């Protein structure tokens, strides 16, 4: 199984507001950068979208180390929030509908073919690839809001 390292980040200008996401995929000596824009969204939605798009970009089942500075994203897997939400019919501990259920379901589908290890990276802590994802996300916002 191919081993891939992925870094992801999401950003929003206002929360909610225009948002962008960025991802860097590393496989051996290969590197791929992805980014995208949404005109009205939240930071958390862009964090999830970055992971979705990065995993969808993989052509084969892979062993993935996915790094994100989003505790929301990483903890959903590492602390089994997603499993609990699914078991409870997508209702959280406060008996409210889980926010971003649509994207969580897309992410689960995108992750299904892969063995994903979800890892937290300190935000803005001089991790080059995480910083690059932030640049990609912010550039997507800038490009999407011009004119």
UniProtKB/Swiss-Prot annotation:
Full protein name: Ribonuclease H
Subcellular location: Cytoplasm
Biological process per Gene Ontology, one example term: DNA replication, removal of RNA primer
Superkingdom in the source lineage: Bacteria
PROSITE patterns attached to this UniProt entry: RNASE_H_1
Binding site for Mg(2+) 2: 9, 134
Gene that this sequence comes from: rnhA
Main location: cytoplasm
Subunit note: Monomer.
Positions of the RNase H type-1 domain: 1-142
InterPro entries: RNase_H, RNaseH-like_sf, RNaseH_domain, RNaseH_sf, RNaseHI
Stored Pfam families: RNase_H
Cofactor note: Binds 1 Mg(2+) ion per subunit. May bind a second metal ion at a regulatory site, or after substrate binding.
Catalysed reactions, semicolon-separated: Endonucleolytic cleavage to 5'-phosphomonoester
